[in-house]
């Protein structure tokens, strides 16, 4: 799927939110953390990722276009919080107490680990598998590993191997 073109107004709204959150954090933490690089190259079902070493936030343009307001209000500060935790505390658990504190006390945003966006437009084909207790959907990559005999996946609930079909 080709990456959609983001209107400049949306990019500006994202940057505005990022700068507001960063200014707020710098003020509350009495620091001068730099502005991270923002790129719109995230793919798949992830709304965004924070890359610590390159100090970069990657955002999913498809999910952004489909959920503009919620995406800007939640995903941008979520990813910024990861970078700020890394700068302020060093390497910590991705959604640990430091991240939660950064989200809620510093940025004033509810600390949610995952988004609730509809994923139909970004979800790849999946393959049905089952165990004794439920149905599962495996990605193409996992399905191919099963077919080649490279992997056996088990249900986290019952522990039984997953079977195609």
Curated annotation (Swiss-Prot):
One of its GO terms (molecular function) is zinc ion binding. Its cofactor is Zn(2+). One of its GO terms (cellular component) is cytoplasm. Keywords: Cytoplasm, Metal-binding, Zinc. Zn(2+) binds at residues 78, 82. PROSITE patterns: ZINC_PROTEASE (PS00142). Pfam families: SprT-like (PF10263). GO terms for biological process: response to stress. The active site is at 79. Disulfide bonds: none annotated. It is found in: Cytoplasm. Its main location: cytoplasm. InterPro entries: SprT-like_domain, Uncharacterised_SprT. Residues 22-163 form the SprT-like domain. Binds 1 zinc ion. Belongs to the SprT family. HAMAP family: SprT (MF_00746). This is Protein SprT.
